[in-house]
Swiss-Prot record:
One of its GO terms (molecular function) is structural constituent of ribosome. Pfam families: Ribosomal_S13. PROSITE patterns: RIBOSOMAL_S13_1, RIBOSOMAL_S13_2. Located at the top of the head of the 30S subunit, it contacts several helices of the 16S rRNA. In the 70S ribosome it contacts the 23S rRNA (bridge B1a) and protein L5 of the 50S subunit (bridge B1b), connecting the 2 subunits; these bridges are implicated in subunit movement. Contacts the tRNAs in the A and P-sites. Transmembrane segments: none annotated. GO terms for cellular component: cytosol; small ribosomal subunit. Residues 92-118 are annotated as: Disordered. This is Small ribosomal subunit protein uS13. NCBIfam families: uS13_bact. GO terms for biological process: translation. Part of the 30S ribosomal subunit. Forms a loose heterodimer with protein S19. Forms two bridges to the 50S subunit in the 70S ribosome.
Amino acid sequence: MARIAGINIPDQKHTVIALTAIYGIGKTRSQAICVAAGIAENVKISELSEEQIEKLRDEVAKYVVEGDLRREVTLSIKRLMDLGTYRGLRHRRGLPVRGQRTKTNARTRKGPRKPIKK
């Protein structure tokens, strides 16, 4: 298994799909990385040479991925909560942030129903 950005990349998958195992890299960004590294998208990771894998590592290093990206997202949410913005309040209360209805639905965000105590 090749190791890129601290993640074990699956060997038996095509390069484009395998790179999406890294948090912060989707299919579009994965295609851009393959083009920049000069690697065909339909080649499996196990078929790549060590220098091609090194090129992929260099290209991935240009982006904010994995732990840094997770930290950045967490800090931006924390910043919204500290500022007291509407979005921050919604995050703090565990409610939908982007304007969805909450009278019905929103169960994923609100969690399971809590019985009314009498």
